[in-house]
Amino acid sequence: MNTLRPGDAMLTDWRDAAARFEREIAKAVVGQDRAIRLLTIAIFARGHVMLEGDVGVGKTTLLRAVARGLGGAYERVEGTVDMMPTDLIYHTYLGEDGRPRVEPGPVLRRAEDLSVFFFNEINRARPQVHALLLRIMAERSVSAFNREYRFPNLQVFADRNRVEREETFELPAAARDRFLMEIGMEAPRDARARRDLVFDPRFHDTDRLTEEVEAGVLDFERIGTIASAIQHAISAEPAIEAYVVGLWEALVRPGPAGIRLPGIAMDRLVQGGASPRGVAFLVRAARVRAWLEGRDWLVPEDIRAVFPEVMAHRVFLEPVYEMRRAQIVPDLIRAVFETVPAP
């Protein structure tokens, strides 16, 4: 797999490796097949991810398993109200001799080897910290100590504290748009999986659980090259292009599209969002999904499979409806699918 070969053989090798990667990750987390598939899509689409879910559903375990399967370095930081932007880059302390010392922070500690960076409870950090993180996400580089550091293989994952609202700073819409996906994680609903998580001691030791994942299933240093090859290999027929544009139009202008939701003024519902960048992200993710399914062309199901996670957080509602966002946006997306005919 690590020796790149031209054409379909190379992508077939990597698709087989991606399937093995998913199987390895599933050893560490139970009942999260959809989240694993979406994370795999994000990895090969070279996009950053916001994880949504309650405390204790396995977000950290999942990301540690992903980092091990990818190879490269894993770093995690906890968002706090007193965090400064520089805390991501370096930290200072007094040495035993009383002199100040400066050491690299979590972003620089492993530099080019950093493949997974997890920002836990990102909304506890202040906007200044968000700004630096977003720059690192966009440019995969940062300037410090009179030089520029590059992170060509970096993938940023973050999650938000959805329960406690004191001393939190919600990311503005423009910041959330930088994330390719927002992926929800819930406790498994399957009774067997629930019993295993509670009663099987194997799932109580996350360190050992993570070690069961085969290391370096994917060569993280080559994913950028493969990601580009995937985008060029997967074609979209004119009918699919028209379908994507139709979904986009109906999402941002649901009233004129004939969509109706009970008790909602559809002409006032959507304030903005769903930019061309967001729709380009949608197609990028859909192409990866098609590749994982063994096709070199897009079908409507590729678009629909990633649409909620890629587009939902990019829709900005009127303030009067924002408090009901968790209910309204899924209903809106379902109505969009029902209204826009698939080719």
Curated annotation (Swiss-Prot):
Chain positions recorded as ATP binding sites: 53-60
Pfam families, sorted: AAA_3, AAA_lid_2
The keyword Nucleotide-binding appears for this protein: yes
BP-aspect Gene Ontology terms: methanol metabolic process
GO cellular component: cytoplasm
Stretches of the chain forming a coiled coil according to its record: none
Localization per Swiss-Prot or TrEMBL: Cytoplasm
InterPro entries, A to Z: AAA+_ATPase, ATPase_AAA-3, CbbQ/NirQ/NorQ/GpvN, ChlI/MoxR_AAA_lid, ClpA/B, P-loop_NTPase
Alphabetic keyword roster: ATP-binding, Cytoplasm, Methanol utilization, Nucleotide-binding
UniProt GO MF annotations: ATP binding; ATP hydrolysis activity
Family per similarity comment: Belongs to the MoxR family.
Function: May be involved in the regulation of formation of active methanol dehydrogenase.
Protein name in UniProt: Protein MoxR
Gene: moxR
